[in-house]
Structures are given as structure tokens and as C-alpha cells.
Curated annotation (Swiss-Prot):
Family indicated by similarity: Belongs to the serpin family. Ov-serpin subfamily.
Quaternary structure (record): Monomer. Interacts (via C-terminus) with CASP1; CASP4 (via CARD domain) and CASP5; these interactions regulate the activity of inflammatory caspases. Interacts with PRTN3. Interacts with GZMH.
Modification N6-acetyllysine occurs at: 136
BP term (GO), one: negative regulation of interleukin-1 beta production
Positions bearing Phosphoserine: 298
InterPro entries per record: Serpin_CS (IPR023795), Serpin_dom (IPR023796), Serpin_fam (IPR000215), Serpin_sf (IPR036186), Serpin_sf_1 (IPR042178), Serpin_sf_2 (IPR042185)
GO cellular component, one term: early endosome
Biological source species: Bos taurus
Compartments (UniProt record): Secreted; Cytoplasm; Cytolytic granule; Early endosome
Protein name, per record: Leukocyte elastase inhibitor
Keywords from the UniProt entry: Acetylation, Cytoplasm, Disulfide bond, Endosome, Lysosome, Phosphoprotein, Protease inhibitor, Secreted, Serine protease inhibitor
Region of interest called CARD-binding motif (CBM), as start-end residue ranges on this chain: 349-377
Thylakoid as UniProt keyword: no
Any one GO molecular function term: serine-type endopeptidase inhibitor activity
Amino acid sequence: MEQLSAANTRFAVDLFLTLTEHNPAGNIFISPFSISSALAMVFLGARGDTAAQMSKALHFEGVEIHSGFQSLNADINKCGAPYTLKLANRLFGEKSYDFLPEFLASTQEMYSAELASVDFLRAPEDARKTINAWVKEQTGGKIPELLASGMVDSLTKLVLVNAIYFKGKWQEKFMVEATKDAPFRLNKKETKTVKMMYQKKKFPFGYIKDLKCRVLELPYEGKDLSMVILLPDDIQDEATGLKKIEQQLTLEKLREWTRPESLDLLEVRVQLPRFKLEESYDLQEPLARLGVRDLFSSKADLSGMSGAKDLFISKVVHKSVVDVNEEGTEAAAATGAIAEFAMLVPEEEFVADHPFIFFIRHKPSSNILFLGRLSSP
């Protein structure tokens, strides 16, 4: 499981950085875990060069993938958790294709994923509506339209859909009455007014000296999940001020910055904007830049999925929504006890009034469920 978590984090960082290249200053929000998990399902049926390209981009070499995802999904979606986290994957295939029974059995067993047959050939618009209705249901209504009109047509053979929905409450809630209007600096020149939440409590807090960057961990109820925020002291470059951090982002660095030894439980005065992000991605181009090329063309070898040789993935659409407020976080994406001592604790300031990087992680497995950059609340 540890190897799989490392692979997923490497892929998360790679994909995030690929998206930042094309979008150096805007908001970004993805669920890398759900994208990895959805692609792993396709990987079950990939062979030859297609499988090799996927394995390399997803860092799957030498990793127990399918049984790993099976136990990881069970661990993260566990019953009785104080949060709601629902991961749902499904392949929608053209109904005139015959899919291999062993592939269908494997996806069901490992990913609890059905293959739904739809009539792309004769009724693509009905197929699109069927897919959207399923995603809407799986995300508690947060993502009502994953596929826009015209996204599928009569040539579509296979669409990979993945949705993840998260709703968690902060362990330490922000008091609504403490929220005030405050300026948020978008860059060195522009500001906008936001609803700034405030609280003073003990949180795991760290400082990365060479990056001049603060690290704050805000746990959710139950402590299995937390949001980690990387906030530079100031805007250093001409865009969001996050270039320096983005240039150093790797699995190893992330682990080093956020491991328990790097963070101290300190009294922190936290100012964090209330924000909601809703981002949509067609992942074909970013995945191609990471080396997954054949999957989306007639070169694809998905012979482990169907006897047909002309099967390829038409679309990988990922849409994610996160809503951060005083109570906690609602995010949807379609992709030990501490002894406390009474003593005078130095106070730290954490004023998130300019762009920052944040991620929501599942601590027991070290998986990054969501990863984003807030440039403009």
C-alpha cells in the first residue's frame, strides 16, 4: 500500500505541475487519487505499448496496483467515518462492442465498477444524459453536468467517468461571526474583497526556511483527513508568488515539509478565505504530455478489455468542486493522541490573504485525495 501511495503522490505532483504550465496564474483543483484510480481500471485492460506508457506515467512499475487500490478504496470509504467520501468509477462503452467477461469481472471485483453499455452510435445525446445523471447521483448533486453538449458523438466508443465526493467538518470550526470582509492580494498589483474566516487554536504548523513558506495543517473530525496549506510569506514573482514552491514540488519534498517532525503543535492565528472552486479538465492533453499517448488514438491496445482492435478511450473528463467554509469542506470531483501541556505557547500568524497551494490528504495511507492552487477565491 505504501508503494501505491508513493506512486499516486508522484503522479499527483506530475499532473499538477503539467496543469500549472498551461495555467500559470489561475485556480487549479483536481482529485489526483480518483484520476489514478480510474486510469488503473483502464490499465487492467491495457496491453503492449499502451500499458507500458500508462505504467510509466502513473509510476506503477513494480507496484501491486489492483489489489492495492481495492484495499485503499475500502480504507478510505470506510463505514462509520465522521466524513463522507464517496469514490465512484464507471466505464461507459458502446453497446455494439463485446467486452471480455474476465475484464468485467475484474473491474467489478477490484474497483466495484460496472461497465455500462450505452448507444453512442445511434443516440449519443441520450448516452450523454445517462452519464450525467449517474455522475449527479454519485456526487450528491454537486456535479450535475460532467459532459457538456457535444462532448460525445456517434464515433465515441468508450468514456471513462470518475467522481469523488467529499464532505468533512473541521475538528476546530471557524466561528461564523468572526468572518469579515478583507482584501485578498491576487498578485503584486491587484486585490479583491473576500470573506475572511478567523480562529486562534493549536494546529500543526511548520516553516520552510529556504522557500520562506508557512505550512499549516487543519484536521477534519476524526483526524484521518486533513487539509495542508503551503503559504509563501509574500508574493515574490510576477504571477501568484507560488513559482518557487511549484519548482521544488516532488514526492520527497512534500513528505519532508509535512511530516509530523517538521510540524509543531502551536497556537496559530489563522485567517483563511471562504472559497469555492469548480474546475473542469479534459485530461487527454495533460496525460499525453506525461507520456500516455496511444490510449486516445487508434494505436491503443486495449485487447484485455475487448477482442476488438479499434477500441480506444475517447474522453477522460475530470470535474472537481470544493467548498471551504466555517464548518468544513465539501468537495466533489468527478476524477495518536497528543499530550497537551499548560504553558505559554508562542503564537504564530497564518494570514492566507494571497495565493496558496493546498491539499487534502488521507493520513493513514498518505494519499493526496485533492490538490489545488487558490489564486483567486
